[in-house]
Curated annotation (Swiss-Prot):
UniProt similarity note: Belongs to the PTH family.
Organism for this UniProt entry: Hydrogenovibrio crunogenus (strain DSM 25203 / XCL-2)
GO cellular component, one term: cytoplasm
UniProtKB keywords: Cytoplasm, Hydrolase, RNA-binding, tRNA-binding
Gene that specifies this protein: pth
PANTHER family, per database record: PEPTIDYL-TRNA HYDROLASE (PTHR17224:SF1)
Residues with site note (Stabilizes the basic form of H active site to accept a proton): 95
Binding site for tRNA: 17, 68, 70, 116
Subcellular location: Cytoplasm
Gene Ontology biological process terms in this record: protein quality control for misfolded or incompletely synthesized proteins; rescue of stalled ribosome
Name recorded for this polypeptide: Peptidyl-tRNA hydrolase
Pfam families from the UniProt entry: Pept_tRNA_hydro
Length: 192
């Protein structure tokens, strides 16, 4: 395994999407930036907003692609290529329909599961072998309602549960940054 050098929060740019379920990945990296007291800055060469934190004397990049969800891979590929970050050193944080609000799960690899941001990331990186943090948002129950569901804000109760899961996930971030995925998974999966 490799320690994480790039943390990408998936979401859609623009105020109209800011509070939607599909932006749970943005919420996570924004929370990490607050904890490390850093600001996101527009980075046109990366098609997104980026911030840098330090872990064990090494740079770790935070990225919010500003390409819209279905083109997230372009932004991820641009920053990874520029800083020579391998796919296995990337953590992609995204909303997950198949998990209830309040649940967060780590994975070391996998398919896209119908998530367009992951689909584009896999295509852009040429591999599915990158780490993921899946933030549960619940499912509307009918697959025909998924698009409307992810592009709406969660209820106050669900948002509080998602925020709790984000908090729990940020607590295991030091393990991820120290290349201890097994410990991070164990801690997180027993909490949420």
């Amino acid at each position: 395994m490799s320690s994480v050098k790039l943390i990408v929060g998936l979401g859609n740019p623009g105020g109209q999407y800011e509070q939607t379920r599909h932006n749970a990945g943005f919420w996570f990296v924004e929370d990490v930036a607050r904890q490390y007291n850093v600001q996101f800055r527009p980075e046109t060469k990366f098609l997104g907003e980026a911030a840098r934190i330090q872990s064990n004397g090494l740079d770790v990049w935070l990225l919010k692609p500003m390409t819209f969800m279905n083109r997230s891979g372009q932004s991820i590929q641009a920053i990874a290529k520029f800083y020579k970050i391998a796919p296995e050193e990337i953590l992609v944080v995204h909303d997950e329909l198949d998990l209830d609000p309040g649940v967060a799960r780590l994975k070391t690899s996998g398919g896209h599961g119908g998530h367009n941001g992951l689909r584009d990331t896999i295509a852009a990186l040429g591999t599915k072998d990158f780490k993921r943090l899946r933030l549960g948002i619940g499912h509307p129950g009918d697959r025909n309602q998924v698009v409307d569901y992810v592009l709406k804000a969660p209820s106050k109760t669900d948002r509080a549960l998602i925020d709790d899961a984000i908090y729990d996930a940020t607590r295991v971030l030091p393990d991820l940054l120290n290349d201890d995925m097994a410990r991070a998974m164990n801690e997180l999966h027993t909490k949420t």
